Amino acid sequence: MPQENIKSKEIILSIDAGTQSIRAALIDTDGNILHIVKTPIQPYYSEHPGWAEQQPDYYWEMLCKTTGQLLQKQEHLKANIAGVTLTTQRATMINVDKDGKALRPAITWLDQRKADSCKILPGALRPVLKTVKLLDTVESAIQDCEANWICQQQPDIWEKTHKFLHLSGFFTHRLTGEFIDSVGNNIGYLPFNNKTYQWAGKYDFKWWLFKIEQEKLPAMIKPSEILGQITKKASLETGIPAGLPVFAAGSDKGCEILGSGCLTPETGCLSFGTIATFDVATPKYVELRPMIPPYPASVPDTYYTEVSIFRGFWMVSWFKEEFGLQECILAEKNNDVPEKLFDSLIQNVPAGSMGLMLQPYWTPGIGADSYAKGSIIGFGDVHNRAYLYRALLEGLIYGLREGGELTQRKTKVPVTKLKVSGGGSQSEAAMQITADIFGMAAERPHTFETSALGAAIDAAVGLKLYSDFPSAVRSMTRTGKVFEPSLKNHQLYDNLYKRVYLKMYGQLKPLFKEIKDITGYPK
């Protein structure tokens, strides 16, 4: 077990490259964040409508800047670093040559371009797939596969591609010189067998759906195993001591789940990030929807089932930009962040927002109808922007409750505990609304940096500082604040959820389709 004297403890350098920032943290074996540096990044740029790209070298420069600043400030702790670990945003894809040099901009997970499915999916097969209600799922997967688009639109780039990597794989090569990645990062439109945690077999239909040659894919290892060692070149650029082992972890969402202490399906893990998600960890392969598999966890031989709201707590940023000028001005004056002031904005708004109901489908999620749209109903003369903001939070959490109920039906395991992480969990109002809508206590971890912490847990197990994941989680995670539900508010929310929210999409769905047919939006 780890020693008690903090000066003699091993320290883990955890790098967390998210959508809006890159963090580097020094974390001890008790799960304490000893020091952290956060560098905001530009999530993407868009040269065409619907595109969302970023230069891979920009990501690397921001990573080097972040680790460099951290280790300059904490030079005295360098000798205590026992290992390095890495977690990144999901499904951001990069084409590289034999030297690991990017051949084109990264296509981020926010990108909405579509490949031509007609060039891949035979017309004769469409009626069959439609009969078994899988046509939309298969067609969407083909269209959303970044590799398919590149093959069709930039065949010269695809021909030059040596490896097609996640951002995590790109960083791993820059750090270690190896084309290798963690199974826990393998999320996206790739020929991967989620049941076996390996690339698909030779005759698997996924090779037909996703036009990727196997030799262009990296080697894969399990979370907590060693990816490689920091090279001398990487050391010069990042400030990380050469020779340190780099341990496989998982995606940023996956590491959030682990860092929140979720290891079994009885615990529901809510992530209040750009994407809002409801996940459970399970040893069993369970598809919540046909042909949409659970994804590999940050723990070996485990799956995460996930329901996501694509525009999750991004909605808070949307509200800030469109309706939050007053809070933005006040926050700048007081050197604060506007989001904190929104809690005060709604303190006098009653639970249920006097019937103002929001369904947060600003962008359709996985498995949703392509023409799905967000909606707000129930306006009256009492409603103002404060009511709108509370309705926004309530709508997001109604959506997560719906996801939680689907999860429990499919896993056949009741959720008895809620853990909430992500930037939005810093909102006291959002946490209380969560407890009230779900009707059970909502726990916030001891740190908001659960993604970096989850990656550090992988490294701690890999370093043999703990014998297994349960013991590492017991020692490195703990509950911060617990929000208990109000019975009165829960009864109100339960009625609004069952009698209104769950009926909204079905009632409005035909109108959403008409809107798309008339306006052509979304394409």
Regions found by a protein language model. Name each.
Residues 63-82, 154-158, 203-213, 238, ...:
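Phosphate/pyrophosphate-binding loops at sites that engage ATP/ADP/AMP, CoA/4′-phosphopantetheine
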Residues 17-19, 130-251, 316, 359-360, ...:
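Gly/Ser/Thr-rich active-site cleft segment
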Residues 58-59, 123-139, 266-269, 461-475:
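A polyampholytic, Gly/Pro-enriched intrinsically disordered region
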Residues 37-77:
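N-terminal phosphate-binding loop and adjacent alpha-helix
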Residues 27-28, 94-97, 150-152, 173-174, ...:
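Short beta-strand-to-turn element immediately C-terminal to the catalytic PLP-Schiff-base lysine
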Residues 2-39, 44-45, 82-120, 156, ...:
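Glycine/Thr-rich phosphate-binding loops that ligate phosphate moieties of nucleotide
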Residues 2-8, 231-240, 250-267:
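Conserved phosphate-binding catalytic cores of ATP/NTP-utilizing and phosphoryl-transfer enzymes
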